[in-house]
Amino acid sequence: MIKYTIQRVLFMLLTLFVIIGMCFILIRLLPPPPVSPDDIHYEIIEARREAMGYNKPLLVQFGLFLKAVFTEWDWGISDKLYVGQDVFDLFIGKMPATVIVNLYSILFSIPIGILLGIFAALKKNTWIDYAISTLTMVVISVPSFVYAFLIQYVFSFKLGWLPFVMKAGTDYFTWEMFKSMLPAVMALSFGVIAGFTRTTRAELTEVLTSEFMLLARTKGLTRTQATVRHALKNCMVVILPSIFGQFVGIMSGSLIIEKIFSIPGVGQLYINSINAPDYPLFILNTAFYTAISLVAAIIVDISYGFIDPRIRMGSKK
């Protein structure tokens, strides 16, 4: 496991380096956003671009960029959206909104998804199972932004129960702020609930038909006891890594959902950096989203070995 983990981490770093390098070079091939001489930050931006070697060969520019990141953790300054401000400070300031909205979504979605999956598996080949399975496939097939518009139409426009967009401010743990987050939380939750429902039902259905479950029943355990003590424990080998992956991914947020509900998070910052365009912000966000995806994949893979000692990742035997 240790050897496998080290290999995965090294491959992750290599992948991250290649993706950042490709994005950096492709962006620097484009002309930098123009800055008016009348802008009060004109001299700062020009001096910064000179220091980062905008007039030098691309590989030299990339080397200067890597040196600034690794020696000073300096990702540059915004030259379009937040002119003159440090992009990493801007990024950190946007993180709490993204994390809190996605954390609410996960805490709401995982229990419901697992319970629906268990219920569907226990009612296999009944109308309840067919209804849950069909609804799950429909929900998974529909993009999250469709739910966002439906929620806004029904709960915000027609019923007037919820606001259209997230409340401004940083009072994240007040009732007013939580209420304003609910539409985004609901829109993010549908897909997660459906995913866990499908996974749980598939795994539990297979386990319930295993021979060891028949043996457990013949020893006098009721169906409920056998399911809770044995079947669910075996299902967790697949379900728990998915939960770990979801929790790692809470920082990534949702680009479209954050834009629709005006969530001041990193997702909306990413979209704005593309539209501006703001190249330093774009590079930092790209590195972040790539790193989160790679770390989540590694944690999911490694967690299999810790959950079930019989699994040895990377073993040739």
Residue spans of the language-model regions?
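Alpha-helical transmembrane segments of integral membrane proteins
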Residues: 2-3, 91, 95-128, 144, ...
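N-terminal signal-anchor/signal peptide hydrophobic helix marking the start
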Residues: 6-15
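Hydrophobic alpha-helical segments of integral membrane proteins
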Residues: 9, 44, 48, 58-70, ...
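Hydrophobic alpha-helical transmembrane segments of membrane transport/permease proteins
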Residues: 16-64, 159-177
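Hydrophobic alpha-helical membrane-insertion segments
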Residues: 17-22, 137-150, 242-247
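An internal, D/E-rich "acidic patch" concept
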Residues: 54-114
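Membrane-water interface segments at transmembrane-helix boundaries in multipass membrane proteins
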Residues: 77, 133-195
